[in-house]
Amino acid sequence: MNKDLDYIFPDPPEGVDPRALDPERIPESVAIIMDGNGRWAKKRALNRLKGHKAGIEAVREAIRCASDLGVRYLTIYSFSTENWSRPQDEVDALMKLLRNYMKTCLKTAEKNRMCVRVLGDKTRLDEDIRTRIAELEEATKNNDGLHFQIAINYGGRDEIVRAVKKPSAKVQSGEVDPAGITADTL
């Protein structure tokens, strides 16, 4: 590791040189759940939107650190299916932040050869956001740098429901014999 990593480790423990990190011990994949932006803002007497904006800055820093450290995959869990139950003005503000982030994310991806994928159920997102996602994924699909995955409108329960519906529909249409459904076919 020969990059200047002082910004990641501004005050390393005594005897630790960040430039001597063993690349073999750097994880290939890192996942971050974006939780607590509202609490962060409240603790600082700021409105929740300021917390969400700070969260976006944290994502930018995570991308930079992951790239510099040689992490291959970075997944950010940013907006769960449960987040739709927040007050409508907060959901609207989050969608506006997402729209703006998609623009800057493309610039970052182009600059750093980053491949971007958006995970989750995109059907509930507005058409313009789905279009931006499709453009971003298409523009970056052949990039060979950090693989950045953004989970939007995701949820464990929702994933299970969608996983069950797919083979159920095939059984109902006669395409698949129920006896043929195994863990591998799911």
What residues fall within each predicted segment?
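Flexible, compositionally biased loop and terminal segments
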Residues: 1-186
